[in-house]
């Protein structure tokens, strides 16, 4: 990086969002004394730097990578972004939708089709500039550095050589990501921070760096950690100390060389946590249960001709049902003729019952008329109570309970209720959703050690830090935010720090606006 002082076309702070993908709640706070470079970023070299610590930040449902990321950088629940899950069935097109493609543009295309604005759109509309590194969501960004097949191939070869596992090496991924941000990959110099400064003589106002290594390392820690059955907190603290903290040192030096460090506000963020897998459930567990009475897709049967579609799962398993009388996917399946037989077959599977925590069943307000009032999006199905009955129609009806009763089954009950109501659209919602016990995952890869996407605090609550030398003119002092926050709040926070009016219609809010009345003085 060239030495000197860089600036954008106007004065103001430079926001760098460091997204530590999959980092659990309070990992940094609990180990900060062992992280000298994080200490400098958060507290400053003398320990007197302004910061705001938000220890309890709720993710959106599902707490899975791309839907959570999309919601975080749009400020909208999945229902409004169109990215409702990692994989889902579209009842109108009969297609299974996934988010991975060679061009890495599927999320951007979904947002464009739905006229959904991103953080980078709002920044651009305000006359400011933005860049991203490693992020798949790039809609509205002026510059973006992405990865490709060569990058991931190298990462996997390196890990196979070092650790004997054909998965991407997390340290390599994060090191190369920071390289990409600061100076670019071989073909991406012009889109890196150094290249933008050299060719455009400015520094972007918003820069996002997505560091995926924590998530990868949580999925596949080294063999010594697995052999001693390390907890997920131990695994993440180890990775933070040995890999991320040295990277932060490189970042600090790079920004100081460019002459912009004193203007920077860092937002240290995460979009989901991680849990150690306790039980592996074969991902195709439901297929033999339903195949006898329901037509499932196959090489000889298309999705449109099937009458049940089972999604790949993690901590949940989703089942889509067709109305077998009309033969139409957009017609609500009949409760007694379509939904009940599927539920009965699922509950007859002993592996399902040993892992099941809760089951919810979709409602269709104003569309289905079978003698029950349908006024919500879901019922909680009392599967244990139903099992104790004769299993007849009246017992099935009685087992359909208000979704609000989900609060009796989960520590985060109210949050989960809201999340379920704000996840799907009419075209993408499944009819049956199984929710597993903590640590129980539909997972065919027995080498995978950790996972996410569950409805438990370890996955659903993360922590944010807002800090850096550029913060004190806006928010002086050191604060711990006492109320709950949301990953949806990232967009309102960034626009606030840049002096951009709050975009209308967001689902998130700005916890920084009244920080004095909602925080205590920090004591780290």
Predicted regions and their residues:
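Short, structured active-site-proximal loop/turn typified by the sulfatase FGly-forming signature C/S-X-P-X-R
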Residues: 26-81, 129-132, 477
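Active-site neighborhoods of enzymes that stabilize oxyanions during catalysis
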Residues: 116, 305-493
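Boundary at the C-terminal end of the N-terminal hydrophobic targeting segment
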Residues: 6-8
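Active-site-proximal cap/lid insertion segments
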Residues: 164, 199-201, 211-260, 278, ...
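Acidic/histidine-rich catalytic neighborhood
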Residues: 258, 263-264, 270-328, 359-362, ...
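His/Asp/Glu-rich, glycine-adjacent segments
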Residues: 71, 76-229, 385-391, 443
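Loop/turn elements at helix/coil->beta-strand transitions in domains of secreted/extracellular proteins
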Residues: 11-16, 48-54, 125-131, 201-207, ...
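Beta-strand elements within well-structured catalytic alpha/beta cores of enzymes
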Residues: 12-26, 41-42, 72, 123, ...
């Amino acid at each position: 990086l060239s030495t000197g002082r860089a600036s954008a076309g106007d004065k103001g702070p430079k926001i760098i969002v460091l997204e530590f993908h999959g980092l659990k709640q309070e990992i940094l706070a609990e180990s900060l004394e062992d992280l000298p470079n994080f200490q400098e970023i958060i507290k400053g070299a003398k320990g007197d730097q302004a910061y705001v610590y938000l220890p309890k930040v709720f993710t959106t449902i599902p707490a899975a990578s791309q839907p959570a990321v999309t919601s975080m950088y749009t400020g909208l629940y999945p229902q409004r972004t169109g990215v409702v899950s990692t994989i889902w069935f579209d009842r109108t097109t009969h297609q299974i939708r996934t988010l991975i493609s060679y061009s890495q543009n599927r999320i951007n295309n979904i947002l464009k089709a739905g006229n959904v604005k991103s953080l980078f759109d709002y920044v651009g509309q305000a006359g400011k500039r933005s860049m991203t590194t490693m992020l798949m969501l790039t809609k509205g960004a002026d510059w973006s550095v992405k990865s490709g097949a060569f990058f991931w191939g190298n990462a996997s070869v390196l890990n196979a050589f070092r650790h004997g596992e054909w998965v991407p090496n997390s340290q390599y991924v994060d090191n190369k990501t920071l390289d990409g941000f600061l100076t670019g990959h071989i073909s991406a110099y012009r889109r890196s921070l150094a290249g933008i400064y050299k060719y455009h003589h400015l520094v972007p106002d918003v820069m996002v760096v997505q560091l995926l290594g924590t998530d990868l390392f949580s999925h596949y820690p080294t063999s010594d950690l697995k052999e001693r059955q390390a907890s997920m907190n131990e695994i993440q603290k180890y990775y933070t100390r040995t890999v991320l903290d040295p990277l932060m040192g490189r970042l600090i030096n790079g920004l100081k060389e460019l002459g912009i460090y004193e203007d920077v506000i860092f937002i240290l963020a995460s979009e989901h946590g991680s849990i150690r897998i306790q039980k592996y459930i074969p991902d195709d567990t439901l297929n033999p249960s339903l195949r006898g009475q329901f037509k499932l897709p196959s090489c000889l049967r298309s999705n449109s001709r099937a009458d049940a579609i089972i999604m790949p799962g993690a901590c949940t398993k989703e089942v889509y049902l067709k109305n077998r009388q009309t033969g139409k996917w957009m017609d609500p399946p009949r409760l007694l003729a379509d939904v009940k037989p599927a539920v009965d077959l699922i509950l007859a599977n002993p592996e399902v019952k040993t892992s099941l925590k809760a089951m919810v069943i979709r409602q269709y307000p104003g569309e289905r008329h079978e003698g029950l009032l349908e006024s919500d999006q879901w019922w909680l199905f009392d599967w244990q109570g139903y099992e104790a009955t004769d299993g007849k129609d009246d017992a099935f009806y009685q087992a359909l309970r208000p979704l609000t009763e989900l609060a009796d089954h989960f520590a985060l009950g109210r949050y989960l209720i809201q999340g379920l109501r704000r996840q799907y659209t009419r075209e993408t919602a499944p009819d049956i959703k199984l929710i597993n016990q903590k640590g129980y995952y539909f997972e065919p890869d027995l080498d995978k050690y950790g996972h996410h996407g569950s409805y438990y605090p370890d996955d659903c609550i993360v922590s944010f830090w807002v800090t850096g030398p550029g913060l004190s003119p806006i928010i002086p002092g050191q604060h711990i935010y006492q109320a709950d926050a949301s990953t949806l709040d990232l967009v309102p926070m960034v626009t606030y720090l840049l002096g951009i009016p709050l975009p209308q219609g967001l689902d998130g809010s700005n916890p920084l606006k009244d920080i004095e009345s909602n925080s205590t003085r920090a004591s780290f």
